[in-house]
Amino acid sequence: DEQARILRTLLQNNRKRELEQASFTLLYSGMSLAALTHLTRHRMQALCAPDLLENADYNRFVLPESVRKAGMESRYREAFSIAEAAARKLSSMSAGKDALSYLLVSGLKVPVVSTMNAGELYTFFRLRTCERAQWEIRELATEALKVLRAAHPALFSLYGPTCFMTGACPEGRMCCGKTAQVREKFSGTL
């Protein structure tokens, strides 16, 4: 239809300025500090995260499947308990935030609100839904894309990893080797 044709034309432009007029706000209710570092690399966004030291909850963390499969879940949980005990001890000694910040473990979960325009989301989804992206940010980005596709299918059905959007993988020798499966996945409903 005409709307889809116009959107495809916009996505083929190098500048994509028209896409900057539409903004979308997403809530990530439990993103690890590790994934947050990937999100903050996208400079064209308004990002709201709580004060990490005041809101650190050492009982809310991401448990990677690789840790579980390695049989290291109890040791992993213990690391958070040790970090929490050290943070309490330093706090009781009136340690400054500069010292306490070193005890923030990358797996801690925080709620994050991000607002990006459709142009920045184009870049975000191309990079972060790729099989080569860090696993957690890839899962969060794929879920965000699923939500946006449900709300705005005409535009966001065209978004996804680069191989889906252009038909070619930009990773060269580092390609995941699953281009056909990835393209099929993103051609569907996710």
Predicted regions and their residues:
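Family-specific signature for flavin-dependent thymidylate synthase
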Residues: 1-190
